[in-house]
Amino acid sequence: MRVRNSLKSAKVRDKNCRVVRRKGRVFVINKKNPRFKVRQG
């Protein structure tokens, strides 16, 4: 999982990407292609 400053470009990389908030952190998760997993904060 990568840590990025901005998830703006990360969420449009694939159509299966979803933005999720967990415990004050923002994640981009992708069930179909897990290599797109990103975390912010």
UniProtKB/Swiss-Prot annotation:
One of its GO terms (biological process) is translation. This is Large ribosomal subunit protein bL36. The keyword Transferase does not apply. GO terms for molecular function: structural constituent of ribosome. HAMAP family: Ribosomal_bL36 (MF_00251). NCBIfam families: PRK00831.1 (NF002021), rpmJ_bact (TIGR01022). It comes from the Bacteria. The gene is rpmJ. Keywords: Ribonucleoprotein, Ribosomal protein. The keyword Ribosomal protein applies. One of its GO terms (cellular component) is ribosome. Belongs to the bacterial ribosomal protein bL36 family. It comes from Rhodospirillum rubrum (strain ATCC 11170 / ATH 1.1.1 / DSM 467 / LMG 4362 / NCIMB 8255 / S1).
